[in-house]
């Protein structure tokens, strides 16, 4: 044991280029609740992240059983949008259980999320019958939708 105890998950975070757009997706499309939104102390962020000129606005949204932190850096000026592939180390996503995967993908598309591949049905193993799809927005924020084998038409 490491000498400390993990008490639980606090949040998962995505850095985004447009906080308004990303909040709209999670609140309007996914039904999450906007908990807080606002700028953070740049000096503290510089110390915490070791990024000179760190200037951010942060929002927290709450979904069923989990909280997301959405961060938009306004500075430094040389920040970039990184488009990693799903197979690249460091790539991350969240997985959301849904009752209708086609509807979830369609609504996500209305907010700029596009299918990374196809909606598939797992045909063997412990998840046989489960339907799965990855969607990504222009920042590379990746949301996986999962529909249980017993939910809806297949």
Language-model regions: role of each:
Residues 1-5, 14, 37, 60, ...:
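Vicinal oxygen chelate
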Residues 8, 55, 90, 129:
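Exposed loop/turn and edge beta-strand positions of beta-sandwich/beta-sheet ligand-binding modules
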Residues 9, 61, 68-71, 91, ...:
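Short, structured motif recognition centered on aromatic/hydrophobic residues
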Residues 83, 91-96:
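Short secondary-structure subsegments characteristic of cysteine-rich extracellular domains
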């Amino acid at each position: 044991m490491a000498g400390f105890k993990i008490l639980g998950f606090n949040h998962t975070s995505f850095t985004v280029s447009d906080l308004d757009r990303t909040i709209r997706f999670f609140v309007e499309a996914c039904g999450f609740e906007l908990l807080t939104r606002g700028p953070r102390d740049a000096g503290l962020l510089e110390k915490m992240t070791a990024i000179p000129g760190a200037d951010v606005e942060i929002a927290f949204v709450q979904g069923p059983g989990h909280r997301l932190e959405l961060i938009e850096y306004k500075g430094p000026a040389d920040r970039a949008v990184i488009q990693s592939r799903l197979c690249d180390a460091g790539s991350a996503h969240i997985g959301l259980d849904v009752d209708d995967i086609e509807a979830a993908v369609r609504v996500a598309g209305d907010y700029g999320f596009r299918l990374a591949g196809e909606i598939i049905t797992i045909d063997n193993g412990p998840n046989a019958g489960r339907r799965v799809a990855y969607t990504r927005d222009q920042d590379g924020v990746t949301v996986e939708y999962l529909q249980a084998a017993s939910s809806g038409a297949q």
